[in-house]
A protein has these predicted regions:
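Short catalytic/metal-binding and nucleic-acid-binding patches
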Residues: 1-188
Length: 188
């Protein structure tokens, strides 16, 4: 076959339907631009703020030096606001971190991937995956010790039975591109 099939440079985003989504976004070249505590806290607060502003209801989140994950319910009107929401977060945090580093215009963010979660098993597995992600990356021994994720919040808001059930959900079959380990710490 002589016809070439164009290869997309970024993932196709299918965001028409309202629903629950799992989202992962990473920095350009997986650089740990947010490795310092203050930077990480700004990114963390920024995610919580834009989600609220765009009426996305976060269920779980984990924010790191070079990527983040979250599970959220979209607004009832649908998920089409996701690119604008993440564009605002990425734009503001990129300008801010570039100002700190005196590198105006440097590319900070790469792209994001989203998956609609339309089965309860997928939803529960990804919730637990996000709650436990700091443990997965070797940053803390227990998820609730990591300050920029939802595990501590979840453990306070849920009943002990809900916490036990959630943490018993297996995540070993969750298919997530999460190869950020070797780049997460500062390259100083």
């Amino acid at each position: 076959m002589d016809a070439e099939i164009p290869w997309p440079r970024s993932p196709l985003h299918r965001l028409a339907a309202a629903g629950t989504y799992f989202v992962t976004a990473g920095t350009y070249l997986k650089k740990p631009w947010f490795a310092e505590r203050r930077r990480l806290e700004v990114l963390h607060r920024g995610l919580l703020k834009v989600a609220d502003e765009f009426a996305w209801h976060l269920q779980a989140w984990a924010v790191f030096s070079n990527h983040y994950h979250f599970v959220a319910h979209s607004p009832e009107s649908g998920a089409k606001s996701l690119p604008k929401m993440l564009g605002k977060l990425h734009g503001k945090t990129a300008v801010w971190v570039n100002k700190l580093d005196q590198t105006p215009g440097r590319k900070v963010w790469y792209n994001y991937r989203e998956t609609i979660l339309d089965h309860e098993g997928s939803y529960l597995a990804r919730l637990n995956y996000v709650h436990q992600n700091a443990v997965h990356h070797g940053l803390v021994p227990v998820a609730n010790q990591y300050p920029c994720c939802s595990a501590r919040w979840f453990e306070k808001a849920a009943t002990p039975a809900q916490v036990a059930m959630m943490y018993a959900v297996k995540t070993d079959r969750v298919n997530v591109i999460d190869d950020f380990d070797d780049k997460m710490r500062s390259e100083g």
